[in-house]
Amino acid sequence: MAMSKIVSLTGLLASASLVAGHGYVSGVVIDGQYYGGYLVDKYAYSDNAPDTIGWTTSATDLGFVDGTGYQSPDIICHKDGAPGALTAEVAAGGKIELQWTEWPESHHGPVLNYLAPCGGECSAVDKTTLEFFKIEAKGLIDGTTPPGQWATDDLISNNNSYTVTIPTSIQEGNYVLRHEIIGLHSAGQKDGAQNYPQCINIKVTGGGDATPAGTAGEALYKDTDAGILFDIYSDLSGGYPIPGPEVFSA
């Protein structure tokens, strides 16, 4: 079979895997303490769901937001995202381990992390007023052989978890942490990229005086961005341009 046909078949199989279960952030660990997240496949159907630090969402299918939703509020903290009632405290410079329920191996792509100051209690914030600055991102790790090794592969190998460090220089206060996977397994075609944004409320303590400029959630991406419209089954020797704003550095 010709290589082009093999690559096409690989892409087709990856698209078919959409029926496979995606995951979500079920909880986080901060300084040894576990905080439960919003269990969308359970709490969305309950009249007595507990308060959590995780934002609620209507994405009970564990689905995604694609390029057609990049200018809608759904891209901010997933479909119909609404603030969690609780907030977890973390020291500036501290680490947050985000635990996913699962992640499909075929759904290769980057992992990105943003913060947005709430300007008050995050439980009452209007998500459309949030302005996000990127604090960390990982994309293509090894592109020797398509579809390559990606940040999602490392997440899977780390027991479906990802750890992000809060910058030491930012002002203390209440923030929304926007943690996101972008699945690129179908991104060779327009609106094929799949965004899975997950949001939690945190309070940063002991920080510095930095107030990084941010970007509204609906302005983070365009469906034609080089890191959004990207074929992972082609030659990857040129690397991968991580989409969105540049990572904040103090």
Swiss-Prot record:
Record localization: Secreted
Main function: Lytic polysaccharide monooxygenase (LPMO) that exhibits oxidative cleavage beta-O-4 linkage of lignin resulting in the formation of aromatic compound guaiacol. Catalysis by LPMOs requires the reduction of the active-site copper from Cu(II) to Cu(I) by a reducing agent and H(2)O(2) or O(2) as a cosubstrate. Does not use cellulose, cello-oligosaccharides, xyloglucan, xylan, chitin nor starch as substrates. Able to depolymerize the lignin dimer guaicyl glycerol beta-guaicyl ether (GGE).
A Gene Ontology molecular function term of the record: monooxygenase activity
InterPro entries: AA9, AA9_LPMO
pH effects: Optimum pH is 7.0.
Residue numbers binding O2: H185, Q194
Family in the record: Belongs to the polysaccharide monooxygenase AA9 family.
Temperature dependence: Optimum temperature is 100 degrees Celsius.
Main location: secreted
Pfam families reported for this sequence: AA9
Protein name: AA9 family lytic polysaccharide monooxygenase AA17
Cofactor-binding details, from the entry: Binds 1 copper ion per subunit.
Residues linked to a glycan: N159
CDD domains: LPMO_AA9 (cd21175)
BP GO annotations: lignin catabolic process
Keywords linked to the UniProt accession: Copper, Disulfide bond, Glycoprotein, Lignin degradation, Metal-binding, Monooxygenase, Oxidoreductase, Secreted, Signal
Biotechnology and industry use: The activity for cleavage of beta-O-4 in lignin and hyperthermostability could be very useful to design an efficient, yet greener and sustainable process for producing aromatic compounds through lignin depolymerisation.
Cleaved signal peptide residues: 1-21
